[in-house]
């Protein structure tokens, strides 16, 4: 089944050659209740992030309708305002709706205290809304850090050295989200901060959080509770994304386990990304949501 997006959004041209997508006009003629997914895009380059996430959602056998949400208390300068006006809504516009699933992206603000982020108060309102009106929510990188702080009070810790590269993770707990994954799960990371691992382990002991994937050196990378998925890495990254960040940062720190001996990029996490997103849509969204929202 297709991903339903506007024909004039940039991702449409990117995906139409290799994914099953459908424009809004055609979708209206089908008598199928699609899965309603809200994407809270906190990244500065919103179009790039749209392309990454929509390409993963387009691999699902389910029909998925997308709503894009951006903060209104802070509007960045890296995305054309015309694009935001055409394709994005604010929290007030979506408050009357319920959603089957939501995805909250990362943001390049992890070195700041949460309270100093320009849109922090608005983000707390968004989290309040997701808690009450969404069947299952997925939080990515800084979005996951912010959500762990919001839901469980877990502290963010600044790192002396950036976690940057593609890391192998062990499966810690059995879960449907891990169905059909490799024994060692590869995931890109790009962050200057982490979450307090002792607090996370204590929450797991209390039965509040479940650690699904973990790396011995960098700690927990995929966690969940009954309704929320927390991903501290970037499964959505395209092949070149870490390299582009390496160039942007003036070649300061080379991404680990990312280049082969000849300097070519090893794009070896994509199947894991497709599987986790498909499992989330199937088990946590589709099979858990009521037919009438």
UniProtKB/Swiss-Prot annotation:
The gene is metAA. Its EC number is 2.3.1.31. It comes from the Bacteria. It is an enzyme of class 2 (transferase). The lineage of its organism: Bacteria, Pseudomonadati, Campylobacterota, Epsilonproteobacteria, Campylobacterales. Pfam families: HTS. Signal peptide: none annotated. InterPro entries: Class_I_gatase-like, HST_MetA, MetA_family. The active site is at 141 (acyl-thioester intermediate), 234 (proton acceptor), 236. It comes from Campylobacter jejuni subsp. jejuni serotype O:2 (strain ATCC 700819 / NCTC 11168). The keyword Cytoplasm applies. It catalyses: L-homoserine + acetyl-CoA = O-acetyl-L-homoserine + CoA. One of its GO terms (cellular component) is cytoplasm. This is Homoserine O-acetyltransferase. It is found in: Cytoplasm. The record marks 190 as: Important for substrate specificity. Keywords: Acyltransferase, Amino-acid biosynthesis, Cytoplasm, Methionine biosynthesis, Transferase. GO terms for biological process: L-methionine biosynthetic process from homoserine via O-succinyl-L-homoserine and cystathionine. The record marks 110 as: Important for acyl-CoA specificity. GO terms for molecular function: homoserine O-acetyltransferase activity; homoserine O-succinyltransferase activity. Pathway: Amino-acid biosynthesis; L-methionine biosynthesis via de novo pathway; O-acetyl-L-homoserine from L-homoserine: step 1/1. Substrate binds at residues 162, 190, 248. Transfers an acetyl group from acetyl-CoA to L-homoserine, forming acetyl-L-homoserine. NCBIfam families: metA. Belongs to the MetA family.
